[in-house]
Amino acid sequence: MSEHSTTTASPTRTEAELRTLMARAVREVRETNPLAPSITNTVTQNFVANAQLAVGGSAAMVYLPDEGECVAALGGAVYINLGTLLPVYEQTVPATARACAGAGKPWVLDPVGIGIGSLRTQLIEAVRENPPAILRGNASEIIAVAELWGLGDDAAEDASGDGPRGVDSTDSVDAAERAAVACARFTGGAVAVSGTTDLVTDGA
């Protein structure tokens, strides 16, 4: 287990308890209007900003290294999506992850298209030192991240497909379960695997 891991056994929540917690989170967002900056792909920038505004948050879309460092300090959390990359992201993404860690701010990683080109691989390797509080992706993406971060051979053994195919998964959510748990234990946060039936784990 990595030095980053802080996972402890968490209590099992009932569906009713989860609904109550989610409702409370929604109320808190509306009451506090938190800033949640994003370094996101150009395809979804408008959608992400509108979604954040719709739930009561405040949005900011950035892409330069000094912008990432600034909003990491100002915002409540940062969302990073690797769907469409610019050359400057080679500096922006690691710098923002470091700034979040230094400021004690959580950040979310969406490793869209992992395996397409060398830059995505370099970025995901780089942020291993300052891992996200939440990792979300499809099954193939989560398996690929676990393998890239060296979190054991179990993830590769469970893989049922050929890895990510662009933004699509070739693996089932069930096949990504051990990879998701390994990633969550490493980061000390949560991992969400999207699919026909989503999987969310804190590694417990």
Can you name each region flagged by the protein language model?
Residues S2-A95, A99-A101, R178-A204:
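Small-residue (G/A/S/T)-rich helix-start motifs and N-terminal tracts that mark the onset
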Residues N81, Y89-N138:
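Glycine/small-residue-rich loop that forms an oxyanion/phosphate-binding "nest" at active or ligand-binding sites
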Residues S118-G203:
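Conserved phosphate/ATP/ADP-binding segment of small-molecule kinases
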